[in-house]
């Protein structure tokens, strides 16, 4: 397994619909009817079932489905030193729906927490999977902390000063995951998506430069035999979205200059624009694989296979077929509420990705 073989031509973003026993256990824990130990026991059991379900679906890259999290990002961020979770007045406002009000903010000098629970979570997942598949673990990008609401709390005089500490925390996080045995890590990143959405704002160029610096500095600490990918998202909650905008405003930086081993890109509808920005990858000597998120994880209907293959063919105008891959456009449950579909429909989507990829690229 090297950066030349990962991501696979059929890959996955990471999160899955929470099982009913897990939902019930989390509700009981919130109500004080289950202890933390009892909840962890249920989580362990349900993750073991999820691992088997992924194997049964024929996929090679296995995650824990983010089963231990309420949000794709907050659970990780609030366990860094200097970052706390809190209840704001409002949640994130998606298209026609709002999340529960919970967010993170800086409360002290930021650093890696050597007792961060995600390291133990990864070790448990690795033990469950054994040699049956490739273990993939997802965490939010350091860019998720670059919003003023996150850092501008009076602890740091400037964002640049704050960013330096965030960068070091993430370099230490990479080492901690690596030492725990992680060789496939993914940074999920809505910040790039927000830049696509807000590219006409006066602060855009400064925000883009800071985002690029964060990734370049952090990835410079990556061990040679560790694969780190990114997923660029525009929001995913209850089958709705948060942001719109094509990749054009960020492509020169993200596609042309960052050293990721793979880029999971939303391309399931017109919100993401066309493939032309992919041309910037030709300027990037790292040659990371580009994972086309052509299969929607928001809606249960299966896409037309011929149309998906035609879009893959269209993308080869800008990149060689071997550098391209296929995945769902996002996770199936970026929050514990999950998207509006059944588990059976979810697995049909997963199998569909595998089926199309084998027809296009053959076996990995």
Language-model regions: role of each:
Residues 1-364:
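Domain-level signal for soluble alpha/beta catalytic cores
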């Amino acid at each position: 397994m090297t950066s030349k073989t990962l991501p696979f031509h059929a890959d996955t973003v990471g999160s899955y619909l929470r099982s009913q026993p897990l939902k019930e256990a989390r509700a009981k824990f919130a109500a004080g009817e289950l202890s933390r130990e009892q909840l962890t026991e249920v989580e362990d059991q349900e993750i073991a079932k999820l691992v088997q379900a992924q194997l049964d679906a024929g996929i090679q890259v296995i995650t824990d489905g983010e089963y231990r999290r309420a949000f794709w990002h907050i659970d990780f961020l609030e366990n860094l030193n200097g970052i706390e979770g809190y209840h704001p007045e409002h949640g994130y406002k998606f298209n026609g729906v709002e999340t529960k009000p919970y967010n993170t903010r800086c409360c002290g000098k930021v650093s890696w927490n050597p007792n961060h629970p995600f390291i133990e979570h990864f070790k448990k997942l690795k033990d469950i999977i054994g040699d049956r598949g490739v273990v993939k673990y997802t965490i939010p990008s350091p860019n998720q902390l670059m919003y003023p609401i996150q850092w501008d709390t009076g602890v740091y005089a400037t964002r640049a000063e704050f960013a330096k500490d965030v960068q070091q925390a993430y370099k230490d996080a990479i080492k901690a995951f690596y030492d725990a045995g992680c060789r496939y890590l993914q940074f999920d990143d809505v910040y790039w998506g927000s830049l696509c959405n807000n590219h006409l704002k006066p602060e855009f160029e400064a925000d883009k430069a800071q985002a690029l610096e964060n990734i370049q500095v952090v990835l410079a600490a990556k061990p040679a035999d560790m694969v780190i990918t990114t997923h660029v998202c525009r929001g995913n909650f209850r089958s709705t979205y948060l942001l719109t905008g094509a990749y054009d405003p960020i492509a020169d930086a993200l596609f042309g200059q960052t050293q990721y081993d793979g880029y999971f890109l939303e391309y399931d509808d017109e919100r993401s624009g066309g493939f032309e920005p992919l041309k910037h990858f030709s300027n990037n000597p790292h040659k990371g694989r580009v994972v086309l998120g052509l299969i929607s994880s928001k809606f249960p209907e299966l896409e037309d296979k011929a149309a998906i293959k035609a879009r893959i063919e269209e993308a080869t105008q800008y990149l060689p077929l071997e550098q391209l891959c296929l995945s769902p456009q996002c996770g199936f449950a970026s929050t514990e509420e999950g998207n509006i579909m059944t588990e059976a429909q979810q697995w049909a989507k997963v199998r569909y990705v595998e089926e199309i990829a084998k027809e296009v690229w053959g076996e990995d």
